[in-house]
Amino acid sequence: MDSKEKGFSILEVLIGVVILGIGLLGLIEMQVAAVTGNTSANLMSVATTLAQDQIEKLRNLSFTDPNLADIVANNATLGNPPNIASIDHADPNNPIDDSGGTTGLRRYLRFWNIADNMPITGVKTVVVFVYWGTVNGATGLTQHRVMIPTTQQP
């Protein structure tokens, strides 16, 4: 009587396990990249919202309000990245949390710069900066920023 053995040999099983393991490692790497990307996008979204909130507050001030004063003259172009020492105003609550307050995780710094008579006479150019940092492996802290310019008229 002729009987054929059925099933897999140990070598076939090991090769299958190795291939499955390589595939799972790739999926894990993709998951880590997705989580990192989502975190980065969330931080940028919050920073943009904080900058926009500050612009709205500044737009509601009178044209002569001290928060719209051009303290450091001739600093319309602050360079890239801007020199923080040349920026006119800092949020008094710095560092701030996701809502602009001081009760949560305070990871953002908010500044704004005013340039009188830019780009034309009688107009103020307002640029709001929001900075935050992320830990970047062995390289340490990576600084990020959102910069939103607008103009203010009397």
Which residues make up each language-model segment?
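Aliphatic-rich helix starts adjacent to a transmembrane/signal segment
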Residues: 4-52
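Low-complexity, Gly/Pro-rich coil/beta segments used as flexible assembly/activation regions
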Residues: 42-154
